[in-house]
Amino acid sequence: ITTVMPVEFDYNQSTEQAFYFVIDANIGGVPIEEGDWIAAFKGDVCVGARQWIGSYTDIPVMGDDGEEYSMGYMLPGEYPTFKIYKISETTIYDAYPSQNIGFPQGLLAFFEIQSLDVIYDCAGVLGGHSSLDNCGACDANPDNDCDMDCMNVWGGEAFIDDCGVCSGGTS
């Protein structure tokens, strides 16, 4: 098992810390293997990482303690996101926790996460980012989501006519 951490998972230690103990971690329903990595993020900033050693692997999550090295790290009440690095595939996936647990106020805290899962999106892509919009379209582009017409119908065809009346569609 290689112990080399992916460069994307590099972080600085802070005096504000929480440890999230992960019981199970899966990619597409298959348990990850010893040697894979789990990291916590705030946006694009890695705030902690640990190599998977099995159930109850503790993922350190660092907070902003006011020092320059921890700028952009977690603040109380914020929720970390997680990523899994599958070492045999050299692939990093977004992983979703079974429950969201906010970063605490104070210097040290411990939490338990039942599972972290990399899932298939609506397009069948493992770790993909496509989702169904209100009209049932599956894609990863939030700028083309369907709109509600003047009759409050998603993707409807009703419109405000020249007289200011909602016309067409189901009106």
Describe these PLM feature segments:
Residues 1-171:
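Primarily marks secretory-pathway-exposed extracellular/lumenal segments that are disulfide-
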